[in-house]
Amino acid sequence: MPDVDLAIVGSGFGGSILAMIARRLGLRVALLERGRHPRFAIGESSSPLAGILLEQLADRYDLPRLKPLAAFGAWQRAYPDVVCGLKRGFTYFKHDAGRRFAAAPDRSNHLLVAASPHDAISDTHWLRADVDAFLMREAAALGAEYADEVQLESLEWDTGGAAVLRGHRRGAALCVRARGVVDATGPRGFLSRALGIGSQSFPGYPGTQALFSHFTGVARCDEMADYTGAGARGEGPPYPVDDAALHHVFDGGWMWVLRFGNGVTSAGVAVEDALAEDLRLADGEAAWRRLLDRLPTVRDQFAGAAPVRQFDWMPRLSYRASAAAGPCWALLPSAAAFVDPLFSTGFPLTLLGVERLAGLLESGTFFGAPRDGDEPRRQVGAVSSLQAYSDVTLAEADHTAAFVAGCYAGFPRFDDFVQYSMFYFAAASYAEIARRVAPERAAVGFLRAGDPAFAPALRTLSPAGGAARRADLGARVRDAVAPVNIAGLCEPGKKNWYAADAADAIAGAAKLGVAPENVAAALAALGF
């Protein structure tokens, strides 16, 4: 393979998008894949923040074929053969072991938070086998040197400072020489092994495991009587509850149900170690059946379902590397850390990493010194060096882990979870609008990890802190998120049903430092 400027290990969506950007910057790129497309991958649910990140990357780096992936309607028009699913919001149902679920008239046992007002600008679930293959082909079409079935075995640095990657491809020796390397695989990936990067646990985070597969024949909750009837005076939910990231929450963990447009549904569980051991999660499908037997209403939903592939068991779900970058190398956030699929944090974290590394490539800083010429345009949340990139990547992972740990602690008392979840929904909705109308207000990191008031409050009010911290939790969370609450959250009168209402964001314009008409114009352009 010819010498390149940048070797990217892993051709998932993050690696391929970074390869596309690097090619637009005029860099020579090698994109190296251990497997072969199409191939299964977990991490399938997008979000509004991920959508705007895709839009902005596409606009900044002249990648018009990337932009339709930002919204369901544009995706269907541009790429109807690339399978995705409709994600209108976030749906949560609280289950008690051994008891049937019945939607409470006061909605106290479920939560619905819309992410869009209609299908056309909705988020999506990505069938990764289709989407990753599509993005890999796009990167190759832009000139990235793509090689699959690559087994990398070593990394050395030559006397000129270039990285030399050695391995095999289909039985033949392979050598790639690059000025820099990005690991876009996953936890414990190539660079972590080759460089001996250590790992550490997230402080205070529970041990968790996961089991998942793809299914056909999964029933819709909105066609089951147990899940209907919570509206008042004919009021319907803010979106179809199944056209969402649907979560079945129970003590010790949760299940995701993500529907694709081809009749396949992704479903899996993430549970704490004690429950995993009780279920003997390593048994795969048998463990899945044991869990369904404990959740009779969920069992009914899967009564006609059949897995279309083997079950995957992850004996340790969370991971954190001790470093995310060094001289001329970096890990994408997906390779540096992983917390949990809860709240679909993986997509925006990965794309934030792509955006930051793209800025370092654009300036030349990635390779050790800024290149001559004009200073490139500053990006939202831009970092000045690979060390700064490493610091913010791991800080955001730690912050996300602290939040998810609080959510797990809140599962047994569902109202605690509902109240605490408002930290996520307030921060995410604010960031989405701020990136459109006041970018400087979005430069505090994912989930406002760098906000000197918001971030400490998120940790202080965590249900993981114990019962003493739960007194008046709802009121305390409402006060903590008030400066960034532009989505009408924390309102008892809404009874856990939150629609995507432009009026809420327009009313919150002062919190963004702009005039209401600026917000109204941005939302109108988006399609609200």
Regions from the PLM with identified roles:
Residues 7, 23-44:
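Glycine-rich FAD pyrophosphate-binding loop
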Residues 14, 37, 188:
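Conserved Rossmann-like nucleotide-cofactor binding loop
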Residues 80-130:
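Flavin (FAD/FMN) cofactor-binding and adjacent substrate-gating region
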Residues 251-255, 259-263, 270-360, 364-366, ...:
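FAD/FMN-dependent oxidoreductases across multiple families
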Residues 1-14, 30:
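Beta1/beta-strand and adjacent pyrophosphate-binding region of the FAD-binding site
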Residues 127, 133-297, 354:
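Predominantly flavin-linked oxidoreductase catalytic cores and closely associated redox partners
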Residues 39-101:
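N-terminal FAD cofactor-binding segment of flavoenzymes
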Residues 360-528:
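C-terminal helical "tail/cap" subdomain of flavin- and related membrane-associated enzymes
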